[in-house]
């Protein structure tokens, strides 16, 4: 994904520079190249893993709190640790 973003930026800047140098509005070859560089599958993260599966895996995983020792679901761990550390200070 990051490679595609970089390619899109390079092609865009190259097209802008070429248009200004030639005083033209558009270069069809570069437009075609930019169209071919579009992401084919937007449901994947930068490592090529499916986003919907990752959310389910992390939310169902349990973590143990080092402060109180309880096991907390991954989706609620940040909220728990915030309250748990706040209680310890009082």
Swiss-Prot record:
A zinc finger (SGF11-type) spans 63-84. It is found in: Nucleus. Coiled coil: none annotated. One of its GO terms (molecular function) is transcription coactivator activity. The keyword Glycoprotein does not apply. Keywords: Activator, Chromatin regulator, Metal-binding, Nucleus, Transcription, Transcription regulation, Zinc, Zinc-finger. InterPro entries: SAGA_su_Sgf11. One of its GO terms (biological process) is chromatin organization. Disulfide bonds: none annotated. One of its GO terms (cellular component) is DUBm complex. The keyword Nucleus applies. The long N-terminal helix forms part of the 'assembly lobe' of the SAGA deubiquitination module. Belongs to the SGF11 family. Functions as a component of the transcription regulatory histone acetylation (HAT) complex SAGA. At the promoters, SAGA is required for recruitment of the basal transcription machinery. It influences RNA polymerase II transcriptional activity through different activities such as TBP interaction and promoter selectivity, interaction with transcription activators, and chromatin modification through histone acetylation and deubiquitination. SAGA acetylates nucleosomal histone H3 to some extent (to form H3K9ac, H3K14ac, H3K18ac and H3K23ac). Component of the 1.8 MDa SAGA transcription coactivator-HAT complex. SAGA is built of 5 distinct domains with specialized functions. Within the SAGA complex, SUS1, SGF11, SGF73 and UBP8 form an additional subcomplex of SAGA called the DUB module (deubiquitination module). Interacts directly with SGF73, SUS1 and UBP8. This is SAGA-associated factor 11. The gene is SGF11.
